[in-house]
Amino acid sequence: MPKRGKKAAADDGEEPKSEPETKKSKGAAKKTEKEAAGEGPVLYEDPPDQKTSPSGKSATLKICSWNVDGLRAWIKKKGLDWVKEEAPDILCLQETKCSENKLPAELQELPGLTHQYWSAPSDKEGYSGVGLLSRQCPLKVSYGIGEEEHDQEGRVIVAEFESFVLVTAYVPNAGRGLVRLEYRQRWDEAFRKFLKDLASRKPLVLCGDLNVAHEEIDLRNPKGNKKNAGFTPQERQGFGELLQAVPLADSFRHLYPNTAYAYTFWTYMMNARSKNVGWRLDYFLLSHSLLPALCDSKIRSKALGSDHCPITLYLAL
């Protein structure tokens, strides 16, 4: 395969997030000195979209995924305008922080995305939540991973289509001080088993905020974050086991194995986004049988509206 190339609270509440460590290594300090000297931060430039597969087939499916950090706040920040311009066939949203009976009416204005499915905690308003919006009606839709311990927070939607199964997920954060790390490890094991079973029946696409930076290249300050949520050895190992056991491929790294400074999350603190001090926490993972259909995996880092940016997948099915 050729290779190419937290915050002020929103009005809909927020989930505590672990922020990047501010303490800098000597190497990071040198980078900061260079930036101060006028070189500026190293920003990621999303290359032109590749809309053909390795065999030359044209893309037939476009999927977007975005952690919106609260639907209502995201809409106020013109997130829907970006979606209308991007025009995906399927839109997956995470951290919606909105129960289904309080969904903003503006969502019905999205052109073509008429089949809409939502999951939210039954007892926690303004927390977690995921959504899946599609032009085509799925053959089947289900919610959660089938284990009561892990299905109380509205974190997973599964949609089966003719040639693949799509899972969108908002994976639990290990929390400040790693207070939920033990729970996260239990989640990782249960989620891995659930996905392996799904993938044994039909090719799988997993997308969403998976709340882990897999390798050092996937965050700006790896040395200072090894004991922070999202980059602990346990979480990284769990992600690696997910890739191997299901098995799945990281679509972005498959196409861009050595591309650095490509992030999808930046804390609202310390002007992190303008400095591109970020983390790659959002992914499209694919069954290996889908790799011949992979055209491109995009990070839309210039799209605003959340502390995450959207990502886009092109497939030629």
Swiss-Prot record:
Phosphoserine modified-residue sites: S18, S53
Cofactor field: Mg(2+); Mn(2+)
Site (Cleavage): K30, K31
Active site residues of this protein: Y170, D209 (proton donor/acceptor)
Residues with the N6-acetyllysine modification: K6, K7, K26, K30, K31, K34, K196
Site note Important for substrate recognition, residues: N211
Residues modified to S-nitrosocysteine: C64, C92, C309
Cofactor remark: Probably binds two magnesium or manganese ions per subunit.
Gene Ontology CC: one annotated term: nucleoplasm
Sites marked Transition state stabilizer: N211
Single GO BP term: DNA repair
Site (described: Important for catalytic activity): D282
Location in or out of the cell: Nucleus; Nucleus, Nucleolus; Nucleus speckle; Endoplasmic reticulum
Activity regulation behaviour: NPM1 stimulates endodeoxyribonuclease activity on double-stranded DNA with AP sites, but inhibits endoribonuclease activity on single-stranded RNA containing AP sites.
InterPro entries in alphabetical order: AP_endonuc_1, AP_endonuclease_F1_BS, AP_endonuclease_F1_CS, Endo/exonu/phosph_ase_sf, Endo/exonuclease/phosphatase
Pfam family name, one: Exo_endo_phos
Impact when changing T232A: Reduced CDK5-mediated phosphorylation. Confers neuron resistance to MPP(+)/MPTP (1-methyl-4-phenylpyridinium). Loss of CDK5-mediated phosphorylation
Tissue-level expression: Expressed in both resting and stimulated B cells stimulated to switch (at protein level).
Main location: nucleus
Additional comment: The specific activity of the cleaved mitochondrial endodeoxyribonuclease appears to be about 3-fold higher than of the full-length form. Extract of mitochondria, but not of nuclei or cytosol, cleaves recombinant APEX1 to generate a mitochondrial APEX1-sized product.
Function: Multifunctional protein that plays a central role in the cellular response to oxidative stress. The two major activities of APEX1 are DNA repair and redox regulation of transcriptional factors. Functions as an apurinic/apyrimidinic (AP) endodeoxyribonuclease in the base excision repair (BER) pathway of DNA lesions induced by oxidative and alkylating agents. Initiates repair of AP sites in DNA by catalyzing hydrolytic incision of the phosphodiester backbone immediately adjacent to the damage, generating a single-strand break with 5'-deoxyribose phosphate and 3'-hydroxyl ends.
Name of the protein in its database record: DNA repair nuclease/redox regulator APEX1
Taxonomy of the source species: Eukaryota, Metazoa, Chordata, Craniata, Vertebrata
